[in-house]
Amino acid sequence: MNDREKVIEARGICNRFGRQVVHENLDLDLYRGEILAVVGGSGSGKSVLLRSIIGLRRPNEGLIKVFGQDLAGLREEQRSLVERRFGVLFQKGALFSSLTVTENVALPLIEHAGLSRADAEHLAGVKLALAGLPISAADKYPSSLSGGMIKRAALARALALDPDILFLDEPTAGLDPIGAAAFDQLILTLRDALGLSVFLITHDLDTLYTITDRIAVLSQKKVLVAGPLAEVEQTNDAWIQEYFHGPRGRAAEQAATRAGQER
């Protein structure tokens, strides 16, 4: 893995809110084509880290390189070109309630790619199909969609500009187990088909056991450990041991083992 290209390289990241220090000297890499899961206890700063990487928050200290470029050092137009290579799915979906599903997905194509409304809406249909939404959902408003359909619509919008990196913040939160498993498999399929690099924040142990290549654990204001699941779960840390070897962790591991035997 270490011989592969780093698409994100974070070094010495510090994030503070007044006197509260969330991250201190945090280092993290995302390699091309991998699915990296970021986990940690409440208050460990997972979403703050995501926002720092995608440019919604500037760290108090540290360097973030994306595709080898220091985002903080780029001019606005250069930075915009880099950020167009991001696709972001926020935890709540963040769809515009006054727009239909198709219009939500078409909007970035109109605003950032300069497509006509007709062309943007045609391409939006392609993205909706990629995300596994039925044609019948295209003209609906977010308020009439189920939680799973909202996630898929938001994913279609995240894919609108053909990103290289997909950022997912708790993508299976609020989904039932069947819906969550289907969404996990969709992410895996899209990664393989489109060559995406995926930065995934999750609490879902089933996700960790079924689709991730590496896991980074945020603890003590830094990345305590990052590596394959088999390596991470053996780390001598109280939170890690409880998380991976408690009742829920054991159940997720057993489910993943059964699924592997059935393939």
Placement of each model-derived feature along the sequence:
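The feature captures the beta-strand-to-loop junction immediately N-terminal to the Walker
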Residues: 39-41
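Helix-to-loop junction immediately C-terminal to a conserved catalytic motif
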Residues: 54
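Conserved ABC ATPase "signature" region
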Residues: 70, 118-136
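Conserved ABC ATPase signature
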Residues: 141-145, 149
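A short, proline-enriched helix->beta-strand linker immediately N-terminal to the Walker B motif
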Residues: 160-164
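Catalytic Walker B motif of ABC-type/P-loop ATPase nucleotide-binding domains
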Residues: 166-169
